[in-house]
């Protein structure tokens, strides 16, 4: 599937817990259905002229032990529209990003230790700088919280120059939590709404813990 997702996003990992995640927002509906791809071996965001198979196949290659730089670069070599793709992500050992020369300006990415940020059709580079600063500000916080703070900072710095409509947070963690898979598909202020839902689900988890310990195993990852 190819859809134009002019957007800003962050992919990150938590060295403390082994979690991976992506947070993203755009001025189109249902961004969470296409851009974020997350699993036990890494996190990938595929955007601009979005090809969802890049995310799906990228995770499969990470599961096979292929480093993320090698996995994503190989997929783009076989992609006739790589000049219009923006893709970035992290695995357990590294991080990698690609912004095609035909992505809508302002566009760009940053590859940092343990995370990547990228965007296209943005108000400017300050969006990514703000996201990076917010993500590293408190490394003791859980990954979902850090990703959401980065998304909020990117929106506050200008975000998508066309406006705003949807947002999503997707996290893989050894400890499954109800606030790890959240989508706002159509809203006037999606990042604010994503924060509201995140807070609600945090409260729901605490209620389960108070009443049932770990919630009767509802959010326990099965041992395979």
Question: What is the predicted role of each segment?
Answer:
Residues 1-224:
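N-terminal nucleophile
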């Amino acid at each position: 599937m190819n859809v134009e997702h002019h957007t800003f996003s962050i992919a990150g990992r938590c060295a403390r817990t082994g979690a991976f995640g992506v947070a993203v927002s755009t001025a189109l509906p249902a961004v969470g259905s296409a851009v974020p791809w997350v699993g036990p071996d890494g996190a990938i965001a595929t955007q601009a002229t979005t090809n969802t198979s890049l995310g799906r196949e990228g995770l499969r290659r990470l599961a096979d032990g292929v480093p993320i730089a090698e996995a994503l670069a190989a997929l783009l070599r076989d992609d006739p529209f790589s000049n219009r793709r923006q893709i970035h992500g992290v695995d357990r050992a590294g991080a990698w990003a690609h912004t095609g020369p035909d992505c809508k300006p302002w566009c760009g990415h940053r590859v940092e230790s343990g995370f990547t940020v990228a965007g296209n059709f943005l108000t400017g580079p300050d969006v990514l700088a703000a996201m990076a600063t917010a993500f590293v500000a408190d490394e003791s916080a859980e990954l979902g919280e850090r990703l959401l703070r980065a998304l909020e900072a990117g929106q506050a710095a200008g975000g998508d120059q066309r406006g705003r409509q949807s947002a999503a947070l997707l996290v893989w963690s050894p400890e499954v939590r109800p606030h790890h898979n959240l989508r706002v598909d159509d809203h006037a202020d999606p990042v604010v709404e994503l924060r509201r839902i995140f807070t609600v689900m945090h409260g729901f988890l605490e209620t389960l813990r108070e009443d049932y310990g770990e919630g009767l195993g509802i959010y326990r990852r099965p041992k395979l």
